[in-house]
Amino acid sequence: MTFDDNIRILVKDKEYDMPFSKGLLARSLTAAGMKPSASYTLARDIERELNEQNVLKISKDELRRRVYYTLINRDYEAIAEKYLLWRRILKKHSIIILVGGSSGVGTSTIAFELASRLGIPSVIGTDSIREVMRRSISKDLVPMLYESSYTAWTALRKSSWEEQDSKEMHLLGFERHVEPVLLGIESIIDRSLTEGTSVIIEGTHIVPGLMAEKYQEMPNVIFLNLTLSSEETHKKRFIARAKVSDRPLERYLENFEIIKEINQYIVEKSKENNLPVIENVSISDTVQKCLEIVTERFSNLNDEPIIDSDFY
């Protein structure tokens, strides 16, 4: 049977039917830790098996069982267990993933990759939250908010830093810049938890130790903090970003030492709070590591029977 001969298969849900999709199934498998190529191959094999058996309709539960036992039979036991874990959790609980890191370490890229793998429809950058906060807080009240994270120190009153060294001054400015943005971030988290919706929030303003401690205790609020130890790699990220955006390269390079200080500050805060720090050299490796961390946190929510979800 060729690809064009495939029979249209409907997956039955409680409220509606939907066409079987290899892409959806492959995405579910990659979220469980399977390599994308292997995920698509297995999804294609499942479709072929259903076609050969002339299956026109199949329930989500039955499809899930087929996928699970296919994984077991192909010696993917660990992935099979993670696959079921994801299915149990995603519909039952809202998941809030916070991807932090200094400018240029790649929080946006990783956040969108995770959203694609996990099927989370909403990704919010903290720069956007900052713009909203600027509309409600005047420049006279918090001038640091109207600067970049690495230039916020220039808006400090002289009395705030005249007895501090340059690094302390830079970090104080960064903290004053971050604090009002955190109000917006925490409001989004609270609303997501109340409404039962999942979201990924990414950006420089996610700083452990500055956010309310209660979020670190919640198993479905997951902190992922990225870093780049190599100065050369970090600078190359800025160069690459400047080629595809309007962000001025010179401004980043001129303030690179301050950006490094902020990066180290976020790393130290993460370690102080026993939160993961991930070296973001390879996008694929970073995404895989993030998925492993998220899955481990999910195990604390694994208290429900398998239920329907928007994934297979």
From Swiss-Prot:
Q: Enumerate the PANTHER family for this protein.
A: P-LOOP NTPASE DOMAIN-CONTAINING PROTEIN LPA1 HOMOLOG 1
Keyword list (alphabetical) reads:
ATP-binding, Kinase, Nucleotide-binding, Transferase
Q: What is this enzyme's class at the first EC digit?
A: transferase
* Its job: Catalyzes the phosphorylation of 2-phosphoglycerate to 2,3-diphosphoglycerate. Involved in the biosynthesis of cyclic 2,3-bisphosphoglycerate, a thermoprotectant.
Q: In which pathway does it act?
A: Thermoadapter biosynthesis; cyclic 2,3-diphosphoglycerate biosynthesis; cyclic 2,3-diphosphoglycerate from 2-phospho-D-glycerate: step 1/2
Q: From which source organism is this entry?
A: Methanococcus maripaludis (strain DSM 14266 / JCM 13030 / NBRC 101832 / S2 / LL)
Q: Which residues form the ATP-cone domain?
A: 7-94
Q: GO molecular function: any one? A: ATP binding
Question: Which EC numbers does the record give?
Answer: 2.7.2.16
Please list the cofactors this protein needs: a divalent metal cation
Q: Which Pfam families match?
A: ATP-cone
Task: Give the family per the record.
Answer: Belongs to the 2-phosphoglycerate kinase family.
Q: What span is annotated as the signal peptide, if there is one?
A: none
Per its UniProt entry, which superkingdom is the organism in?
Archaea
Q: Which reaction does it catalyse?
A: (2R)-2-phosphoglycerate + ATP = (2R)-2,3-bisphosphoglycerate + ADP + H(+)
Q: What is this protein called?
A: 2-phosphoglycerate kinase
